[in-house]
């Protein structure tokens, strides 16, 4: 789990905060995952909306909390946690409520595998979102803002130079020049295909992605299919995923994401 060290954090005031604080953005798929976990466990938190369209995640203040400039970020009694899947696991370990992470070794291994796949696909999901859903003029970053983003914040996660930030900078600089070109779009679509096939087969034999029942893995992948459906992805060929998705959508706590 990604809990920042004291030396990673430059916005020092959050180290004195008490209670549960969640920095998030309503349209962010990663933020949606964490809000679902809080809702399922009936956990009250203090929300801090970070407007990604207005570049609030690139401010010195926010980069001092999350050196990557991503949402969500959890601050709990002065401890700072980043990365949505890690925050979900932290919630599961730290608070009362339904347990969404497995104890069975085989399920742990499979969950870690498919959670990493989901995380690795995030830039592809972002590319498809920007190609088909979000207007380019809203999401493209000004070069001056990118210059600030590149140097602001500590640049460290867990005391080490953060390589993830350079990946983010590269994505945004290319998009500022080229938008999301057709070849990138095709590559993004193809990147999902083998994993959707795997999940569709698995859901043919199980109601949920893990044999124990509903889990955080279902939340992670439901958010992906939710976004892909908004983008018009043809799920007709994945009937098991379609049925699973509709079952989850009927859960009230998942509808309000």
Name each model feature, range by range.
Residues 88-92, 111-115, 193-196, 200, ...:
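Non-transmembrane alpha-helical segments in soluble domains
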Residues 123-246:
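GST-like fold's C-terminal all-alpha helical module
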Residues 255-257:
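Conserved small/polar residues in nucleotide/adenosyl-binding loops
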């Amino acid at each position: 789990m990604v809990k920042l060290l004291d030396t990673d954090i430059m916005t020092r005031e959050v180290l004195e905060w008490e209670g549960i604080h969640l920095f998030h953005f309503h349209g962010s798929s990663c933020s949606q995952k964490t809000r679902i976990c809080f809702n399922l466990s009936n956990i009250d938190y203090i929300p801090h909306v970070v407007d990604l369209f207005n570049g609030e995640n690139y401010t010195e203040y926010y980069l001092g909390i999350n050196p990557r400039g991503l949402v969500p970020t959890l601050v709990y009694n002065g401890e700072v946690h980043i990365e949505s899947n890690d925050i979900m696991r932290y919630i599961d370990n730290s608070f009362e409520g339904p347990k969404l992470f497995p104890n069975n070794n085989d399920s742990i291994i499979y969950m870690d595998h498919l959670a990493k796949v989901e995380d690795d696909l995030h830039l592809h999901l972002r590319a498809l979102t920007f190609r088909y859903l979000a207007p380019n003029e809203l999401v493209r970053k000004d070069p001056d803002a990118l210059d600030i983003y590149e140097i602001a914040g500590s640049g460290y996660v867990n005391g080490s130079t953060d390589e993830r930030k350079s990946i983010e900078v590269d994505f945004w600089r290319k998009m500022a020049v080229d938008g999301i070109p057709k070849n990138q779009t095709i590559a993004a679509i193809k990147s999902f295909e083998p994993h959707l096939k795997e999940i569709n087969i698995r859901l043919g034999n199980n109601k949920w992605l893990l044999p124990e029942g509903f889990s955080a893995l279902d939340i992670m992948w439901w958010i992906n299919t939710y976004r892909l459906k908004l983008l018009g992805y043809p799920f007709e060929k994945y009937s098991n995923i379609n049925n699973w998705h509709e079952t989850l959508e009927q859960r009230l706590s998942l509808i309000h994401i």
